[in-house]
Amino acid sequence: MQDHTTEGGFLSSKSSRNTVTNINIFDPANGASTLLFKAPKKEGIPIVIFETGFKNGEIEFNATHSNLVMNNSRISKREPKNKLLIGIRSADSKETTLFVSDKRGAGLKKLVSVPATADWHIDVKNSKLRVVHQTGKGVRIESYEW
């Protein structure tokens, strides 16, 4: 779902800026359509990541997220995970809040809020989402199941 800043239609717009504010999940098997979030996310949803397949020893993803996906070589063959990773970035604080759900939108939960001073990535080989914080001269790493 998009928040249009100028005239336009539901699926298209003449707007100079479109912001994705919710995600519609359509199940072609039964024709059901549901929104991922109960209320639109005014901040916008710039990050939607999910696994799509396996090829040449790597897990494939829905889009190019090379800076967010690491340790993705020599992976044992497996089916794609039934997970969505959604990121919402605050325009004010630049903090990114990460949510996970299954690919049908069920089980949506907030995973972590990542401050602008930290980095995060998916570690494919170890099935982890890692948040890396700089602490003085060292680092602090948080790991979450992916």
Residue ranges and their predicted role:
Residues M1-W146:
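Sequence signature of WD/YWTD-type beta-propeller architectures
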